Amino acid sequence: GGTDFMLYNDGGTFTHNSGKVLFDDAGLSNGSNIRNPSSFHDVEIALGSFSCTAHHNMTCTGTFLVTSGTYSDGSNGFHIDELVTIKNGATINLSNSTTQTKKLGALLVESGGTFRACRNITEFDGSGAGHSGQPSALEVESGATFNNNLGTCKFTSAGDQDIEMDGTGMFYNLELAKTNNDVVMHANVEVENNLTIDLAADHTLRPASTSNTVTVRGTTFIKEGKIGDTTAYNGTNNWGNLVMKSGTFILGSGTNNFESIRNKGGTIS
């Protein structure tokens, strides 16, 4: 908002020196802006009741923390190598662009925090320490809000990635596109549209506990990889329309509901 800038770099040299840059509300009377074509290392946003908008790509080689206020990407890039954290009362709004991809190492939305995903693709390519001690690529705590913005959340790390959706909100499209290791879902995960599985052939989507459930309201696509290996889905699960190009679907001992099944080369066991 407005024309005031807390940092305006229009082509000068900015060296992060592996330090943290803090943007706070000291002296602010309204919202402000940030423009920096260079990379930050760590960034903290502490704006109280105010907001800030990026006027260039936000790139961090470390972490991005919003303790208070609202950060909006202004339809510019958002690429954070490590953990993004949103504290109680704080908000991150990624853009409504239908062509951009935003990249986060991992995301923790604490109770009272709000995250709005990108309308196109929000990619998670790392993992962080979850409340259960597992490497949570995405953790939405109880009391937090996750707004899918009708976009796709894509998980791509070569390591294990945990998904913990304990707050309000569900995925729209969820894509698991990994060359190695598993995806572990905690609690009960809902996908408003489509779930796409594209994992290494010997790796799997699995629950943290056999009682955890999945609800897909559109289509479950299995391009490669497995569902339900190592730990089975033994509760009542709804997979929508199942389309298998390859891969393996291992049915648990519970109830698996399908709207339709089209198996073009996979295995159901």
Model regions and ranges:
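Extracellular beta-strand-rich, repetitive "passenger/adhesive" scaffolds
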Residues: G1-E190, T196-S269
